[in-house]
């Protein structure tokens, strides 16, 4: 079935085998004045949303590597409680401090 706009062109157009019927569609006009929100428009258009990347940097403070893991555990357990909490496995005796930095 022909559209209303196409039917008027079909009636007024000369019939031939090589003719192409095209419908006249209303083109929506975009206003040249851009409306902004009252607080300002700070959005970025056509940018895909991606999560920020988190980089972890490990700073090695104790470079002494021991071959026997059981002696390493014994050394960690023999420290006093006043040495940066190293008895509980989160002090400098683990060999490094972890720093996180978020880059986006």
From Swiss-Prot:
<dbReference type="GO" id="GO:0042631">
    <property type="term" value="P:cellular response to water deprivation"/>
</dbReference>
<dbReference type="GO" id="GO:0055106">
    <property type="term" value="F:ubiquitin-protein transferase regulator activity"/>
</dbReference>
<dbReference type="GO" id="GO:0033554">
    <property type="term" value="P:cellular response to stress"/>
</dbReference>
<feature type="region of interest" description="Disordered">
    <location>
        <begin position="1"/>
        <end position="48"/>
    </location>
</feature>
<feature type="region of interest" description="Disordered">
    <location>
        <begin position="66"/>
        <end position="104"/>
    </location>
</feature>
<protein>
    <recommendedName>
        <fullName>Uncharacterized protein YJL144W</fullName>
    </recommendedName>
</protein>
<dbReference type="GO" id="GO:0005737">
    <property type="term" value="C:cytoplasm"/>
</dbReference>
<dbReference type="GO" id="GO:0120174">
    <property type="term" value="P:stress-induced homeostatically regulated protein degradation pathway"/>
</dbReference>
């Amino acid at each position: 079935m022909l559209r209303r706009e196409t039917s008027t062109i079909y009636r007024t157009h000369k019939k031939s085998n090589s003719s192409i019927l095209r419908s006249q569609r209303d083109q929506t006009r975009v206003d040249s004045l851009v409306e902004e929100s009252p607080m300002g428009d700070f959005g970025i258009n056509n940018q895909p949303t991606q999560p920020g990347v988190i980089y972890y940097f490990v700073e090695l403070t104790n470079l002494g590597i021991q071959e026997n893991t059981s002696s390493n555990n014994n050394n960690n357990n023999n420290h006093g409680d006043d040495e940066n909490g190293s008895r509980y496995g989160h002090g400098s005796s683990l060999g490094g401090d972890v720093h996180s930095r978020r880059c986006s």
